[in-house]
Amino acid sequence: MGKEKGHINVVVIGHVDSGKSTTTGHLIYKCGGIDKRTIEKFEKEATELGKGSFKYAWVLDKLKAERERGITIDIALWKFETPKYNVTVIDAPGHRDFIKNMITGTSQADCAILIIGGGTGEFEAGISKDGQTREHALLAYTLGVKQLIVAVNKMDTTGWSQARFEEIVKETSNFIKKVGFNPKTVPFVPVSGFQGDNMIEPTTNMPWYQGWQKETKAGVVKGKTLLEAIDSIEPPARPTDKPLRLPLQDVYKIGGIGTVPVGRVETGVIKPGMIVTFAPAGVTTEVKSVEMHHESLDAGLPGDNVGFNVKNVSVKDIRRGNVCGDSKNDPPMGCASFTAQVIILNHPGQISAGYSPVLDCHTAHIACKFAELIEKIDRRSGKKIEESPKFVKSGDACIAKMVPSKPMCVEAFTDYAPLGRFAVRDMRQTVAVGVIKAVEKVAPGAAKVTKAAVKAGAKK
């Protein structure tokens, strides 16, 4: 088999009509996890329904419909392979909870693929002032997705026009520059997600197209197709050298074993024998064993979803939203308040001090109060526009002091990114997103230290 391929997550963004589904469907269909049987089944249905031209989007529509009906479809269906990577496509936007998912980070994207509809008027609609495209690109950038690929889709509907492609590249470059990306590091690929041009094989319909290029630290990288552009994503550094942070998703009580917290390692490493602290619960204990997919591990690494057995801790002591860390290496703590840069996305009214919506940060789901609006800032440059504003509204960005209604554990984005970004939820939608700048931490009072931890500590 040789060396296992690296794993990367991509998020596909773009206007609803840009052909996102067709393009994503095409990659998954040609390089991916959909087995032949499923495809044959879909093709048969498509033909029966008179969709015989078998749009790739049909594959994706089927997957989406199944997901929305709550049938958990095999996540493999959202995967495809490039020569270098196993790629997972993160929930395509347009889906209600997309923003929340992107922030609470079931999976942080390593790269965003922006799909632009090349047809007349489409491109303009997607990038207009209120366009979703702008919002998604800005969100991706704010939340730390620093690599971008632009696919100019539907080139077949433009008569494979070089002029149209160049016009879109120029406009899009300006647009992404305003968001914060450097266009020189971004491959621009003219494709037809429907006909397959430049998706996997180089096109024969655009003799003028010389290929894409992008600047990287290692020099200029060149290629022709979208698949090659995805293959040229720089591998993410997985933060194993940082102190452990593992937000709990659930805590189980398992007969004969005991208490088993479950969650995804965000930073650092968890190993059997480690003395860990749970914040804000203030419980310290020893890790007896660590396992993933029912196999025991010597170590759980960033990105691993693990269960681990802890000694002398009741299920009542710790819960979802708590964060587990190494008691001897920057242990996690609860916080009294934190300062964050908040971007208001869609709130019907005005937000002023005292507003108390629910925050989703990693696995925690807790009401927090906007205690003070410190300053209103320009959302692109971060420069101050107004000191102590009375209120902020949709489209504004501000620095705010937030106070959680009950103990919670968060971190500054620059220290531990996955624990430093949050979604503000109200009226069943994401009204704002935030990035935490600084945290006022609280040392636990009379913390519970289990006998196992004391014993293990004495041994060392």
From Swiss-Prot:
Stretches for region G4: 153-156
Name of one Pfam family that matches: GTP-eEF1A_C
Record region (G5): 192-194
InterPro entries associated with the record: EFTu-like_2, G_TR_CS, GTP-eEF1A_C, P-loop_NTPase, T_Tr_GTP-bd_dom, TRAFAC_GTPase_members, Transl_B-barrel_sf, Transl_elong_EF1A/Init_IF2_C
N,N,N-trimethylglycine found at: G2
N6,N6,N6-trimethyllysine carried by residues: K79
Protein name (record): Elongation factor 1-alpha-B
